[in-house]
Amino acid sequence: MREITIVTGFFDIGRDKYAFYSRSVEKYLDYFRFWARIQNQIVVYTTPELAPKVMEIRGEFGLADKTVVIEVEDVFEVEPALYERMAEVELKPDFHQFRANADPEWPDNKANYDYIMLMKYWCLYDAVEKGLATGMLAWLDFGFNHGGKSFSDAADFDYLWQTDLDDKVHLFSLSDPNKIHAGFQLQFLSECLMGAPVILPDSLADDLWNLTKKAMEALVMLDCIDDDQQLLMMSYRERPEIFDVHLSDWFMPMKEYGGQHLKMVEKVEEKRSFLAEIKLKLYFIKRRLLFCKRIYDAAKRYKV
């Protein structure tokens, strides 16, 4: 078994003002505190303003000496030209018309959100380049587990996460990615490969960063942007030999690969009334009809 160095990061992009999945900075810090007692070495990328708070949280568990905080003044200056192109795509009406969910406020349709998702893989690469992460690494989202959504007991994270996975980029997926068309995923915003965790050896951090960056560059050539799930799918398509894909579910890879003791929140099947079921079905029918109309109108414009 090999100890994992965890790389994570948090940058305030105004999620508290998002129309969907709105979360404040304090909420994210609370999410981090829930799992921050993990005994592994952690490298955290964040802004100078938040760096002391991150170190304070790890210090609460006596783990300041196993924590490195990298202050990034402006994360959008890491790849400024690429971000500028992404921001231009966000403003294109036809990009939104192409997507099954055309709402410009949907996170996946926003340039700043998608750029931050790309930065996960830059952080992994940069941590290796700086000599801060060696051996087996894992990207773990700063807000992992959403403060107890899947794993119920924060005390369970007081352990050393280790792995016996081999030297490949290990991705975790909701379904078989070989049965998913990457173009349809881009259009329908369907979910397959999960953006976290990603477990890999330090020797492949550079490859993963270059692949995901290349994927985003390819998307903007098509006047599109998308989040980490799409970038990983495209990277997997480009170099499948360096990846190993494991079927799993949200947050579950940590339990399945080294954290078997983590207690789960009991799942309660949501029961809807007959009227609620009808309303939900009508909502999706309406959304699909609107999508079909947008594509039909686009086909007429392009004289298809």
Named regions from a protein language model:
Residues 1-27:
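N-proximal low-complexity "stem/linker" segments adjacent to membrane-targeting elements
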Residues 21-32, 152-158, 230:
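Well-ordered, non-membrane alpha-helical segments in soluble/globular domains
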Residues 61-130:
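Active-site-proximal specificity loops/subdomain of glycosyltransferases
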Residues 122, 162, 173-177, 230-232:
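Non-transmembrane, aqueous-exposed alpha-helical and coiled segments at domain scale
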Residues 146-150, 186-272:
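Catalytic core and acceptor-binding pocket of nucleotide-sugar-dependent glycosyltransferases
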Residues 167-182:
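Short beta-strand-to-loop element that shapes/binds the nucleotide-sugar donor at the catalytic cleft/hinge
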Residues 258-304:
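Membrane-proximal basic amphipathic "stem/tether" segments
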